[in-house]
A protein has these predicted regions:
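Alpha-helical support elements that line or immediately flank enzyme active sites
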Residues: 109-122, 142-165, 204-210
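Secondary-structure capping and boundary motifs in well-ordered enzyme cores
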Residues: 102-103, 139-148, 161, 191-199
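Inter-helical turn/loop segments and adjacent helix faces that build the functional surface
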Residues: 94-98, 159, 210-214
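Function-dense linear segments that define catalytic or interfacial modules
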Residues: 19-146
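Helix-terminus loop motifs that line ligand-binding clefts
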Residues: 128, 163-209, 213-216, 221-227
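Short, solvent-exposed loop/turn and secondary-structure capping segments
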Residues: 61-63, 120-126, 155-158, 166-169, ...
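Extracytoplasmic/secreted proteins, especially bacterial periplasmic and envelope-associated proteins
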Residues: 78, 82, 86, 102-109, ...
Length: 230
């Protein structure tokens, strides 16, 4: 379950939550698969800013994440500038020569898409594992669409995001340790809707290209489990 901490820059005229068909005014927290919240602003409110922190660990962690990622005094414009700077830093790793403007738009759009997933799932040194329902110390990545990405995206990430590759392999090994086998498409837990064991190719390709900063023996065991049971 994902928790969210919301901070509004404008006063609220009304607020509350709902769960299933029950609406409770004045309440600020609710949990469930069919739950949510609502707010209303005073008449005449034309503009406001909303800051959101999210966490798979806890509501308290969501607040901590928000405090670390968006300063209280940061405006929307300042936050946009900070994010744009971060993306420009990543996308500037490759410089194109030649081609048309349309060609460059296509390339950098695709480049941007490749850096979306797998996504970092850990929260400042800890992560919630949907495979065993526990909070662990360490790094975690999730949302691997492996039968789509094992051929090209993961080898590509070895070139443009090499600092993340070992942690991505570590995350696959952790999924095996916490759930029993490496999933075909963790999103965020087992989905069981893809064929094959394409994580094997991702791990093997990383290994032969020199990425070894993970538990290699455990990775091999995980591959063997997949080979024997899928």
């Amino acid at each position: 379950v994902c928790s969210s901490d919301l901070k509004f820059s404008a006063d609220l005229a009304d607020y509350g939550v709902w769960k299933d068909s029950l609406v409770t005014a004045g309440k600020t927290q609710e949990a469930g698969t069919s739950a949510g919240g609502y707010v209303a602003f005073p008449a005449g409110t034309e503009m406001m800013e909303l800051r959101i922190g999210s966490s798979f660990i806890s509501f308290e962690q969501a607040g901590e994440n928000l405090a670390k990622e968006i300063q209280k005094t940061a405006s929307f414009g300042q936050t946009v500038k900070k994010v744009r700077t971060a993306w420009n830093r990543s996308l500037s790793k490759i410089k194109l020569k030649g081609g048309t403007e349309d060609d460059r738009v296509v390339f950098y759009t695709a480049f941007f898409h490749t850096l979306q997933y797998p996504r970092e799932f850990s929260e400042y040194g800890r992560y919630y594992s949907p495979f065993d329902g526990k909070v662990h110390e360490g790094v975690s990545y999730n949302a691997y669409s492996l039968w789509d990405t094992f051929r090209a995206e993961h080898p590509w990430l070895q070139l443009v995001a090499s600092e993340r590759v070992d942690d991505m392999i570590t995350s696959l090994v952790q999924m095996y340790e916490e759930g029993g086998w490496i999933p075909k498409w963790p999103n965020p837990t087992y989905t069981n809707i893809m064929i094959g064991t394409h994580a094997d190719a991702v791990i093997a390709d990383a290994y032969v290209n020199g990425f070894r900063n993970y538990d290699v023996e455990q990775a091999y065991k995980a591959i063997q489990i997949g080979r024997a049971h899928v």
